[in-house]
């Protein structure tokens, strides 16, 4: 283990249970997951917990519109959220719901402790009431003009424009967001948390390093104005927990939502004998608790939440880490432009590891907004992950398998390996401080060194000389060892790739194993690890994300004529297919023939003759549609070497873009044979 073991509890903000996860949400879960996985990789006891935020009027009203009970709706959303997170490789130790037994008990317990300590006040307030729906209006269901900056169409609790918070009654020209009616004032007894009683503690805590300086400076405005008592109750009808000893009164969603962190962890503790709730939440706990949140909810997590914990006798968070918003192509996410992208839409078209890496490459420990530039996204993934990282293995692994029985050599010159290992402390510090972008740059700089080493050593040339076989063996072994170190450094960011590399290397990638000696170790046969991002997949995401009222055109039925219906010509090849007319050498020289490895082969729906091939050129991947379906099953092609025309102009087909042509011989149907080069040929080599 790298250092003494820490006990860490880490959380992400709870997604609201009335809609799907989108790529704006995913920034936070990817950021938290990377940090959590890093802590586990270092050997620490780290628990990453989360839950759906499942209470409030919005959920109650949406369930009514759907004609179902709120419990049914939030259960359905919970399943969808968990599936999206799992498919993005978000590794929660527990994902729960605020509508749970644990959260009800903890919310009541904290409230009663606050009440008994004198921190709960009651008073009658005049509240906005919808006369058409006969209900008091929650903050978010009243809209009007901000009383501070005069921005229109703002919610009743805070202003998106200036960030001010206020009471719904402070709005100018309020309207009910439920019915559109002008609300009337009606008296109601409400419960308040005495936040001003904690002003001294909060002032010190927010300046203690527990939150970022930018956030502490912003919260300073609250202290300048003087903290106010916080309304924690809502009137029936309301979907949530009823306040003890107060029939018809319910906890405001922002009271029980952060308690949901505790509720989810309590649920985990109750299912595991090795976890104790008090070890993490008791006043004298030595464990670390970290909250990752968006900058829009810092007041709840950095003022109300630590004050509630302090007043109820629990420990406060070690730190609250805030991040900025996500923009797409330099602008706010837009449904009309197709840039308001749901997690599921992305997953239907692209590898989640791509987005994990791109977000990591742009994240820092600050609260800056992050722009998802889709062209830059494709270029960075293709350059860094495919061109630099995976290319390192694809260029060298084949020699180990074919020439050296799959076993790695003892490397004499380990100077480059020592350079790689010498970066582990810096990379660990960057992960720890959430400077993921800087960490990615350090790792990719190492990848550049490794690729330059392979290019200079040129094992594909060494392998041709019988006197240099051992040198070639060492170069390839060294390259794969450097590749192992790089993927270990990237394991928190690219967990699926790391799993695949562990299977390929037949060796666990852990921080403690970074300096392992793998001389004589046997590896498995190399398989393609990652494909290039194709802009057509990004275009498909944008198109699927647009608000479009025009029904999609029904897919055309496939031609029912079978490939086997084509008559077979039994004449000799030259008679049935004479040699074409003569061309000049200059014309032939324009054709760039390259060795390619078939990384992936799959059927093309509605195409009787085509297979879709992903061809690895040893640093670049091209997609080709080949008319060889009658002769080959996709699974029989994967891993084979073949010859392709690499500089053929891309051709847009009904099924996608074809970026070249594979060479095959034969009259057709089952009598087709793709060209397969002899052993020693490598992807990317020119055929002369």
From Swiss-Prot:
Pfam family, one: tRNA-synt_1g
GO biological process: methionyl-tRNA aminoacylation
Note on cofactor: Binds 1 zinc ion per subunit.
Positions of short motif 'HIGH' region: 15-25
Motif window: 'KMSKS' region: 332-336
Domain tRNA-binding: 587-688
InterPro entries, A to Z: aa-tRNA-synth_I_CS, Anticodon_Met, Met-tRNA-synth_bsu_C, Met-tRNA_ligase_1, Met-tRNA_synth, Methionyl/Leucyl_tRNA_Synth, MetRS_core, MetRS_Zn
UniProt-recorded Gene Ontology molecular function terms: ATP binding; metal ion binding; methionine-tRNA ligase activity; tRNA binding
Keyword RNA-binding part of the UniProt annotation: yes
UniProt function note: Is required not only for elongation of protein synthesis but also for the initiation of all mRNA translation through initiator tRNA(fMet) aminoacylation.
NCBIfam families according to UniProt: metG (TIGR00398), metG_C_term (TIGR00399), PRK00133.1 (NF001100)
Family to which this protein belongs: Belongs to the class-I aminoacyl-tRNA synthetase family. MetG type 1 subfamily.
Name this polypeptide is given: Methionine--tRNA ligase
Organism name: Shewanella woodyi (strain ATCC 51908 / MS32)
Organismal lineage: Bacteria, Pseudomonadati, Pseudomonadota, Gammaproteobacteria, Alteromonadales
């Amino acid at each position: 283990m790298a250092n003494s073991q820490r006990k860490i509890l880490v959380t992400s903000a709870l997604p609201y249970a009335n809609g799907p996860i989108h790529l704006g949400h995913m920034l936070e879960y990817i950021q938290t997951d990377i940090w959590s996985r890093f802590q586990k990789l270092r050997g620490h006891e780290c628990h990453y917990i989360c839950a759906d935020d499942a209470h409030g009027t919005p959920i109650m009203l949406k369930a009514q519109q759907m004609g179902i009970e709120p419990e049914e709706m939030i259960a359905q959303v919970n399943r969808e959220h968990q599936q999206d997170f799992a498919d993005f490789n978000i590794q929660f130790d527990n994902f729960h719901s605020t509508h749970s037994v644990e959260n009800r008990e903890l919310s009541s317990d904290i409230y009663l402790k606050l009440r008994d300590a004198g921190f709960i006040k009651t008073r009658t307030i005049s509240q906005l009431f919808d006369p058409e729906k006969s209900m008091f209006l929650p903050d978010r269901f009243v809209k009007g003009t901000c009383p501070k900056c005069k921005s229109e169409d703002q919610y009743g609790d805070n202003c998106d424009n200036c960030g001010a918070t206020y009471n719904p009654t402070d709005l100018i020209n309020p309207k009910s967001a439920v019915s559109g009616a002008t609300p009337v004032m009606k008296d109601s007894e409400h419960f308040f948390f005495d936040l001003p009683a904690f002003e001294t503690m909060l002032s010190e805590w927010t300046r203690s390093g527990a939150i970022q300086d930018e956030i502490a400076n912003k919260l300073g405005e609250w202290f300048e104005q003087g903290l106010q008592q916080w309304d924690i109750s809502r009137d029936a009808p309301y979907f949530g927990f009823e306040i003890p000893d107060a029939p018809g009164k319910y906890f405001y969603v922002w009271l029980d939502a952060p308690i949901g962190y505790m509720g989810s962890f309590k649920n985990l503790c109750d299912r595991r004998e090795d976890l104790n709730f008090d070890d993490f939440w008791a006043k004298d706990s030595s464990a670390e608790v970290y909250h990752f949140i968006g900058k829009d909810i810092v007041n709840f997590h950095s003022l109300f939440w630590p004050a509630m914990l302090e007043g109820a006798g629990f420990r406060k968070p070690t730190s609250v880490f805030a991040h900025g918003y996500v923009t797409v192509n330099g602008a706010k996410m837009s449904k009309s432009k197709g840039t308001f992208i749901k997690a599921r839409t992305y997953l239907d078209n692209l590898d989640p590891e791509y987005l994990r890496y791109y977000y990591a490459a742009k994240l820092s420990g600050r609260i800056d907004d992050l722009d998802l530039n889709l062209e830059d996204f494709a270029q960075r993934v293709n350059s860094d992950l495919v061109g630099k990282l995976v290319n390192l293995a694809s260029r060298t692994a084949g020699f180990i398998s074919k020439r050296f029985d799959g076993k790695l050599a003892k490397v004499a010159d380990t100077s480059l390996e020592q350079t790689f290992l010498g970066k582990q402390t810096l990379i660990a510090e960057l992960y720890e401080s959430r400077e993921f972008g800087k960490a990615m740059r350090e790792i990719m700089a190492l990848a550049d060194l490794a690729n330059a080493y392979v290019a200079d050593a040129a094992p594909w040339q060494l392998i041709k000389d019988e006197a240099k076989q051992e040198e070639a063996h060492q170069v390839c072994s060294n390259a794969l060892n450097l590749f192992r170190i790089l993927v270990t450094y990237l394991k928190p960011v690219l967990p699926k790739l790391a799993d695949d590399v562990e299977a390929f290397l037949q060796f666990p990638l852990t921080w403690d194993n970074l300096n392992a000696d793998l001389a004589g170790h046997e590896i498995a046969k190399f398989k393609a690890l990652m494909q290039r991002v194709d802009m057509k997949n990004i275009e498909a995401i944008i198109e699927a994300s647009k608000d479009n009222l025009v029904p999609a055109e029904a897919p055309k039925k496939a031609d029912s004529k079978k490939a086997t219906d084509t008559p077979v010509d039994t004449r000799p090849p030259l008679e049935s297919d004479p040699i074409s007319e003569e061309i000049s050498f200059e014309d032939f020289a324009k054709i760039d023939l390259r060795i390619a490895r078939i990384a992936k082969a799959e059927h093309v729906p509605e195409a009787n003759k085509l297979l879709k091939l992903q061809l690895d050129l040893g640093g670049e991947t091209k997609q080709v549609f080949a008319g060889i379906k009658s002769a080959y099953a996709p699974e029989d092609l994967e891993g084979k070497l073949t010859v392709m025309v690499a500089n053929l102009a891309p051709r847009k087909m009904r099924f996608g873009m074809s970026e070249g042509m594979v060479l095959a011989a034969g009259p057709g149907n089952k009598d087709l044979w793709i060209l397969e080069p002899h052993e020693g040929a490598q992807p990317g080599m020119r055929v002369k």
